[in-house]
Design a protein with these regions (language model features):
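Transmembrane helix-bundle signature of multi-pass membrane transporters/permeases
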Residues: 69, 115-119, 138, 157-166, ...
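Transmembrane alpha-helix interface/packing and boundary motifs in multi-pass membrane proteins
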Residues: 13-21, 117-126, 160-168, 260-264, ...
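Membrane-embedded alpha-helical segments and adjacent helix-loop junctions characteristic
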Residues: 43-144, 294-382
Length: 454
């Protein structure tokens, strides 16, 4: 039975434990054991596969730790305080007739800013979620002042990230659409490169994401939400004037960090752009004396602590994904669901999308899901007479499903890292569940419509 498939059981255990407020690292570890044992790998085999996968997350964790240190050094420069104080001053100096308008402008300015940055992080400035710890934590005090529901910000960030790479074939979008999606479909025997425009094929799924984002921003989380104004490593009650020399030095370091990542990405360098960019930024901050040598250890340690939890979750998620792949239960899951089609294109599209959702929820990466499902989905689509464009829409959507809404995905971990700086933003309840509802459900519907009409 489908329910007794190791992958399905493992993902269900992970989700149930996470919703029950069991720590996500413990949830991933227990889910790994369940998946391995149900697949017949035994405790030893499961642990070996889990341990082998841990190394895959080490580089990411180190990159995020260094990025956290860089973010803290930027905060030390006074740049975030300058921005936050300017917004707060505008709010407090506004008279009663203008205060509501100023607050509304500030709220939508913040939301628009993080959304645009999310879009640019996938192409123009290809740094993925690296912008979040630099941009979001310094604005937490302003968000509290505005009584902004942080679920709004989480949804805005993730929309900018996920919709962009699944729709726009530039930067990370080129990797997702051409280097992975099209490449694997071609290898499975269907010609799509130069035949199918990815922006046309993925237009309906992308539009469904936009609908989900609009509902989140305009309906679900538009009401004010109270947060305590807590002291954090990014907040300061210091009334001393900001040193503008340090501010401009921080701006230069930020530009250098972004440019170095963009150049390495453009060159297809094997060096990790995120790691190199963080190192470049840190070196510039030290070299320009934004962070004095005698304070560097405390500043950098504080930043690394900020990102350490996210790094540990990413390492654990890699181990979990390794167990799922080693279980040998992913292909049987796809094959078992294929037998349920009975020649129905509508039913086939739904089942293929749901299976993609389950796999991505478990692995935590849409980029890793595509190679797994393409080899089996392409022959099925050919047999059921789906057009090449519909095939691209089905497989592309099946891969992207679950990225926004998986506890182990960087599309959810990134926003949590920035928004939980003061401990008032829960990963499952304030990021994962809202994004699952507002993005995965519309994306499932949009993917099915695309499969039927293209």
């Amino acid at each position: 039975m489908l329910l007794f498939n190791a992958v399905v059981l493992s993902v269900l255990v992970m989700l149930i434990l996470s919703v029950a407020r069991v720590h996500v690292i413990i949830s991933l570890f227990i889910a790994s054991l369940v998946g391995g044992l149900v697949a017949g790998m035994g405790v030893s085999g499961t642990m070996v596969a889990f341990q082998d996968g841990l190394a895959g997350g080490a580089k990411i964790a180190l990159s995020y730790a260094l990025l956290g240190a860089f973010a803290m050094s930027v905060a030390h420069s006074g740049l975030p305080r300058l921005l936050a104080n300017w917004i707060i001053k505008k709010l407090r100096n506004a008279d009663e007739s203008n205060s509501a308008r100023v607050a509304r402008s500030a709220k939508w300015g913040i939301l628009g800013g993080v959304l645009v940055m999310g879009v640019m992080s996938q192409n123009l400035i290809p740094i993925h979620i690296a912008f979040i710890p630099l941009l979001v934590p310094p604005l937490i005090g302003v968000m509290n002042e505005l009584k902004m529901d942080r679920r709004l910000v989480a949804c805005a960030i993730t929309f900018g990230i996920v919709t962009t790479y699944m729709f726009v074939p530039i930067g990370f979008g080129r990797i997702f659409l051409h280097d992975i999606l099209y490449k694997n479909i071609e290898e499975a025997g269907m010609a799509v490169e130069g035949v199918v425009n990815p922006m046309v094929a993925m237009a309906i799924p992308a539009a469904s994401m936009a609908v989900g984002c609009a509902i989140a921003l305009l309906v679900s989380y538009r009401k004010p939400r109270e947060y305590e104004q807590r002291e954090t490593s990014f907040s300061s009650n210091d009334d001393k004037p900001v040193d503008m020399k340090k501010v401009w030095a921080a701006v230069l370091a930020l530009v250098a960090c972004f440019v170095s990542q963009a150049v390495l990405t453009k060159m297809d360098s094997e060096a990790d752009p995120l790691l190199v960019g963080a190192l470049v930024g840190l070196c510039m901050m030290l070299g320009m004396r934004v962070v004095p040598w005698q304070q560097a250890d405390d500043v950098f340690s504080g930043g690394m602590k900020m990102m350490s939890l996210i790094g540990l979750i990413m390492i654990t998620a890699q181990g979990y994904a390794s167990v799922l792949k080693a279980s040998g239960q992913i292909e049987p899951l796809v094959q078992q669901t294929s037998a349920m089609f009975n020649g129905s294109k509508a039913l086939a599209a739904v089942i293929m999308l749901v299976v993609g959702l389950i796999i991505t929820m478990g692995i935590g990466s849409s980029f890793s899901t595509l190679p797994i499902i393409s080899a089996i989905y392409v022959p099925l689509c050919v047999t059921l007479n789906f057009s090449p464009m519909a095939t691209v829409a089905i497989i592309g959507t099946a891969g992207a499903l679950g990225d926004a809404g998986s506890p182990a995905s960087d599309s959810t971990l990134g926003p949590t890292a920035g928004l939980n700086i003061d401990g008032q933003h829960d990963h499952m309840r304030d990021t994962v569940i809202p994004e699952f509802i507002h993005y995965n459900i519309p994306l499932l519907i949009g993917g099915w419509i695309a499969a039927m009409v293209l």
